[in-house]
Each structure stands twice: as structure tokens, then as C-alpha cells.
């Protein structure tokens, strides 16, 4: 990556930075669009088998909600799919390459999928043999490019800090006493909040797993509003992370005026009353909009009784010419006078509709701007910060959560709207997903800035998630032993959830107070021809055996594995045995936790992307009371870090067995 921190001509640096990222974004955009196009080209049945399409559907109108048309696509035969709420889908008459009809997924059932359309829905949607494909559009890439252009245009102090041309300024005063609204913050959280609020340009909060990063960030947001009297734009790269910020804010600070900007289908149902579409519909002036919509509907019905001026009937005439000829009430260019008069009536009513729509848009925009102006905090994804809705809006502070999971240009979308930046993240966990495999895009703005300006950052030190023994290895490997387990979780085990006398002897190898166990499986890594991903049958069988025991005692459990093929194999296996627990990749489970976590490493010959140690960190730190590691010891021992992991797991098990003997 170009070293933006070298001294030099600031104008050239800005231009170099913008050009570099413009090129990288375009490469990534092409990779993503090509990937989805190539996926869609695959035979429909094959694509359905891997969960990326649903075939042979029929649409049913369900109603309208928040400005969208809701349609249920169903069939008799149940389906398994990777498509989930919030996804964009391409709806087609069996051939997705010939369609440009997009919808947002609301809900996925066993044999139906509910979607929301923002456009008029064609009649064929309600007929047989409709196909739905998982899709991606390139709007976020367009917004990244627009943000880069704005970054180049503004060239303000924050831009120069990002490039290393200028240095963040120290606070004018550090002796100010803050009154914390969240009374349960620990000392490291309070310190991070105070330093962030008193900072003038930039502050970075490093939040390792379970340390209450989002909780800390929400206190920062409230302090910015209450103490600094600032208007805040709070963002995250994903809708789930944005909803987490919103949820914390409304639960802990109900007097705060918070508005969530985003498509209603991508916002949690529990939070929808704080969304912009909902607030618009409940505004006192919304009745005017409803009245205008009724008027449009009424005029459309009148209009459609007349002849639409299609090219066949226009014979090259413009609307104005048709209106002129109609007044003469004569035939023209071989068109009977009745047809000309009918077309004129259609045009007159269509013009009325357009005038009303313009009026409707003006009223909607006025209501929207009133709501946004009254808000203390606006919450959105990074991408939605660049939408038309927030065009022209400026903020005192930009707060970005999960900053270590977003590509640098994604963070620029909200950043160009503010004067001060506060970011929270953990660069020791997974980087953003980059299809082009470009290392320069994988290195995040959060990581760059925290390495450049360590004095403008702090780490949250107390973790509230896991047993201290589970924490031990990641703490040493990734966090320089700075983490401490809170007393509330320090010694938690499965035996807090299950009475020891109720455990059958055959289950005690797993259902015990040992927080970490490594189980060696001499399996074989396999790969199917049509998939680049790996699976391991022997490991899957061992996972099943262990999960059966955990489920028997109703212990909340998840299985994590780095490979999609192993995820699919395990899901089928669990379905055959009527086991209903979630299996996911490391990427799919980041930001979450459970009482017991089982990890299947899969590989037996080569490491593949097991080599990305951030994946290992994420996988391990999802567990609260029990972590079970399943892998091929002969392979894993060849890597220094994995060898340390095995030694650690065995030492924890040995230590607890000795304690049991001593009892």
C-alpha cells in the first residue's frame, strides 16, 4: 500500500490516495459482479442445491407496508436456502440474466419467501415458474467512489489526519469531570469514553471480544449529544451492527431522539418504530400524502380508460402535437379522430398525475428533513450514509462501530460528512471480506490509524463473556495479556447449567467443568469437483457425537468451521438426526457468542486459510463456558501458533483433571 504517512506535497498525496482506492474499488466491484453473474449462469437446480436460488415459485400479493409492495413466493415442496432476511434477490421468469427486477427479503419460511418491492410489480410475478436468485447490486461501490470524490474536494483537517499530513490535536482540557449515564461502566470503559468525548479530531477504541465495545460506543454517542451538544451520525458496516447501536441507545437512553435510516426490510422488526419510513408514516402531515396517493389512484383509473399513446398510435407525434391535433377533432396521419382524442385525454390525466407526484415528493422530503433535523443521532450503515436521504447533511461527529470489519473506502462514506471521527473495532479479529483478494483493501482504516496514532486510542480491558481459561490463549497470542476476566464470568462452566448428579457416566467426557478440550481426529480432508471448499467426514461424525451430548443436557451450542462444505455436510447430518443447532463459518459467527462452541478445523494435509490467525481468534472467543477443538493434531502441530493452542488446551484439561483427583 502507498505509504500515505510520508511527508510530501499534500495535494499530490490526496490525489494519489483517491486514485489508488478508485482503482481498487473498481477491481473489487468487477470481481463481485462477475462472481454473482457466473453463479447465476449455473444450472438453476445446481444453484438451488447450494442455497443460492429458489425455483418454481408462484407469487401472492400480501399487501403494502412502509411504501413497499409485499409479495409471498411459495411452492408445495420445502426448500433449504442460504437466502436470508435483508438480502437482495433477483426475481425472474426462470431466466435471471434477462431480468432487472429486484426485491428485499423480509422472511424465509420452509416453503415460501416474503419479499418487498420498491417498484411497481409486473403481473407475471403472480404466475407459475418464478425464480428467485441471491444477488448483489453495486450501489455501495458507487457510494464509495462518490465519498472519495468528496474526500478529494473537501481536503479538510480530518482528511489530512487520515493521510498523516496533519496530526490530531490534543484536548484543550483533560481535567473535566464527566457524569456517566451508564452507571455500570468499568474503569477502562470510562477512560475510553472520556478520552473520546474530549478529543478534538480523532479517537480510536480497541474492543477485544466480550469487552462491551458497543456499550462503550453508545455512552460516547450520548456524551457527544449531552455534553458536547453535537449532532451525531453513528454507523457500522452491517445492518446487524447498526441495529445493535440503535438497540443500546433506545434501551439505555430513551429520551434521546434517534432515527434509523435504511430499508425497512433490513432493520430489525423490534426497532422498526425508530426507522425513517415508520416515522414518516406516523408524522402529522402524512395524511396529505395519503390523500395525494388516493388522488393519483383515482386519476390513473380514469386515465386507463383512454388509449395510451404507444409508438404504434403516435406515428411520430409528441404529446403536445397530439393535444393540438385533438382540438381540431380531425383524423391525422391515418389515425382516426376518436383515437387522437382518446390519446389526448390519456396525456391530460398523465400530466396531472406527474404534477401530483412532484407535489407528493416535495411533501415527503419536507417531512423527512423535519424528522432528520430534530434527531440527536442518526444511525445507518456506512453505505446508507451515502444515500440520497442524507445528501447534503453535515454532522459534528461521526461514530463508526465495527471499524475493523469495513474496507477503508466504506468508512469514508460517513467520514466525509463530519468534522470529528470516533471509531471502535478490533483489528485482531476478521478483516473485511474482499473477493479480489487484494491485501491493500483488507488492511482497514482502523488498523492504520491505531498503529499511526496509538496515543489517540485505548483498549477495553475487562471481558464479560468467557471463562478465564478460554480467554487465556487469545489473550496471550493477540492482546499482550491485557485482558482480565470479570468476576461474574471468571470461573463459569457447564456445571453451572447442569447438576453434576444428573450427568450420565458416558457423557462425563464432555459434560464436565473443563472449559477447554482438544480432541484429535485422524480424518481425511475431501473436496467435491464443483466446489473449492473442503469437508471432513470423520470430524463431522465426532462433532455429531459431541453435540448429541450437549443437546441432551439442553446446553446452548453452536458449531463453527472455516469451510462452507463442512457447514453444509454438518447441517445435513444434524437434520438427519433431528438436531436443531446452528452451524456456521467463522465469518458468519463473528460478533456472537454461546455457552458451548465446537470447532471443526477440517484440514489434514495443508493449512489453507487456517493460516489466517484472526479466524482462530474469532472462533475461540465465541465460547462462554465450554470450547471443544476438533482437528488433526499431526497437521496442526506443524504450525507454531496451533501447536501452542494444542498445548494450552491439553494443559487446561490436565489441570482440571488434577483438581478432580485432589477432591
UniProtKB/Swiss-Prot annotation:
InterPro entries: Coronavir_polyprotein_1ab (IPR050534), DNA2/NAM7-like_C (IPR041679), DNA2/NAM7_AAA_11 (IPR041677), Helicase_ATP-bd (IPR014001), P-loop_NTPase (IPR027417), SF1_C_Upf1 (IPR047187), SMUBP-2/Hcs1-like (IPR004483). ATP binds at residues 207-214. It comes from the Archaea. Its EC number is 3.6.4.-. GO terms for molecular function: 5'-3' DNA helicase activity; ATP binding; DNA binding; hydrolase activity. Keywords: ATP-binding, Helicase, Hydrolase, Nucleotide-binding. The keyword Zinc-finger does not apply. Gene3D superfamilies: 2.40.30.270, P-loop containing nucleotide triphosphate hydrolases (3.40.50.300). Belongs to the DNA2/NAM7 helicase family. NCBIfam families: IGHMBP2 family helicase. This is Uncharacterized ATP-dependent helicase MJ0104. It comes from Methanocaldococcus jannaschii (strain ATCC 43067 / DSM 2661 / JAL-1 / JCM 10045 / NBRC 100440).
Amino acid at each position: 500500500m502507498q505509504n500515505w504517512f510520508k511527508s510530501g506535497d499534500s495535494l499530490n498525496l490526496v490525489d494519489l490516495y483517491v486514485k489508488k482506492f478508485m482503482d481498487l474499488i473498481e477491481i473489487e466491484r468487477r470481481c463481485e459482479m462477475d462472481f454473482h453473474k457466473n453463479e447465476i449462469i449455473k444450472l438453476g437446480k445446481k444453484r438451488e442445491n447450494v442455497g443460492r436460488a429458489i425455483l418454481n415459485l408462484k407469487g401472492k400479493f400480501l399487501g403494502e407496508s412502509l411504501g413497499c409492495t409485499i409479495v409471498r413466493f411459495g411452492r408445495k415442496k420445502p426448500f433449504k436456502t442460504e437466502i436470508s432476511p435483508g438480502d437482495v434477490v433477483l426475481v425472474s421468469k426462470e431466466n435471471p440474466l434477462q431480468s432487472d427486477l429486484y426485491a428485499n427479503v423480509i422472511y424465509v419460511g420452509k416453503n415460501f419467501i416474503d419479499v418487498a418491492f420498491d417498484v411497481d410489480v409486473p403481473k407475471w410475478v403472480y404466475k407459475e415458474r418464478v425464480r428467485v436468485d441471491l444477488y448483489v447490486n453495486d450501489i455501495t461501490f458507487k457510494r464509495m467512489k462518490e465519498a472519495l470524490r468528496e474526500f478529494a474536494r473537501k481536503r479538510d483537517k480530518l482528511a489530512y489526519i487520515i493521510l498523516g499530513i496533519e496530526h490530531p490535536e490534543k484536548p484543550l482540557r483533560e481535567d473535566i469531570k464527566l457524569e456517566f449515564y451508564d452507571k455500570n461502566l468499568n474503569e477502562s470503559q470510562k477512560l475510553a469514553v472520556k478520552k473520546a468525548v474530549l478529543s478534538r479530531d480523532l479517537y480510536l477504541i480497541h474492543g477485544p471480544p466480550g469487552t462491551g465495545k458497543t456499550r462503550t460506543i453508545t455512552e460516547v454517542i450520548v456524551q457527544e449529544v449531552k455534553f458536547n451538544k453535537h449532532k451525531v451520525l453513528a454507523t457500522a458496516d452491517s445492518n446487524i451492527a447498526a441495529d445493535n447501536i440503535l438497540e443500546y441507545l433506545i434501551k439505555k437512553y430513551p429520551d434521546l431522539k434517534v432515527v434509523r435510516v435504511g430499508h425497512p426490510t433490513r432493520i430489525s422488526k423490534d426497532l422498526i418504530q425508530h426507522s425513517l419510513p415508520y416515522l414518516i408514516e406516523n408524522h402529522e402531515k402524512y395524511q396529505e400524502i395519503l390523500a395525494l396517493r388516493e388522488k393519483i389512484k383515482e386519476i390513473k383509473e380514469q386515465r386507463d380508460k383512454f388509449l395510451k399513446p404507444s409508438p404504434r398510435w403516435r406515428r411520430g407525434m409528441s404529446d403536445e402535437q397530439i393535444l393540438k391535433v385533438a382540438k381540431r377533432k380531425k383524423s391525422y396521419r391515418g389515425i382516426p379522430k376518436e383515437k387522437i382524442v382518446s390519446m389526448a385525454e390519456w396525456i391530460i390525466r398523465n400530466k396531472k398525475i406527474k404534477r401530483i407526484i412532484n407535489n407528493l415528493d416535495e411533501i415527503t422530503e419536507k417531512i423527512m428533513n423535519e424528522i432528520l433535523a430534530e434527531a440527536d443521532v442518526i444511525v445507518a450503515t456506512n453505505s446508507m450514509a451515502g444515500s440520497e436521504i442524507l445528501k447534503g447533511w453535515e454532522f459534528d461527529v461521526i461514530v463508526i462501530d465495527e471499524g475493523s470489519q469495513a474496507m477503508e473506502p466504506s468508512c469514508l462514506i460517513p467520514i466525509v460528512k463530519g468534522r470529528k471521527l470516533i471509531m471502535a473495532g478490533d483489528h485482531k479479529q476478521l478483516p473485511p471480506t474482499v473477493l479480489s483478494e487484494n491485501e491493500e483493501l483488507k488492511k482497514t482504516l482502523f488498523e492504520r490509524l491505531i498503529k499511526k496514532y496509538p496515543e489517540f486510542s485505548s483498549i477495553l480491558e475487562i471481558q464479560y463473556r468467557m471463562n478465564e481459561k478460554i480467554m487465556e490463549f487469545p489473550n496471550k497470542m493477540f492482546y499482550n495479556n491485557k485482558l482480565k476476566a470479570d468476576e461474574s464470568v471468571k470461573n463459569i462452566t457447564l456445571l453451572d447449567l447442569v447438576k453434576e448428579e444428573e450427568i450420565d457416566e458416558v457423557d462425563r467426557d464432555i459434560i464436565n467443568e473443563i472449559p477447554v478440550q482438544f480432541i484429535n481426529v485422524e480424518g481425511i480432508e475431501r473436496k467435491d469437483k464443483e466446489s473449492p471448499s473442503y469437508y471432513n467426514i470423520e470430524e463431522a461424525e465426532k462433532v455429531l457425537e459431541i453435540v448429541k451430548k450437549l443437546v441432551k443436557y439442553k446446553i446452548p451450542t453452536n458449531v463453527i468451521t472455516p469451510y462452507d462444505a463442512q457447514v453444509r455436510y454438518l447441517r445435513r447430518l444434524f437434520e438427519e438426526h433431528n438436531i436443531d443447532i446452528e452451524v456456521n463459518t467463522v465469518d458468519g459467527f463473528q460478533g456472537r457468542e454461546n455457552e458451548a462452541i465446537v470447532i471443526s478445523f477440517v484440514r489434514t494435509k495443508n493449512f489453507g486459510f487456517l493460516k489466517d490467525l484472526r479466524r482462530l481468534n474469532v472462533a475461540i472467543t465465541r465460547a462462554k463456558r465450554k470450547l471443544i477443538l476438533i482437528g488433526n493434531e499431526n497437521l496442526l502441530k506443524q504450525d507454531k501458533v496451533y501447536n501452542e493452542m494444542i498445548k494450552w488446551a491439553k494443559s487446561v484439561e490436565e489441570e482440571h483433571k488434577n483438581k478432580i483427583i485432589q477432591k
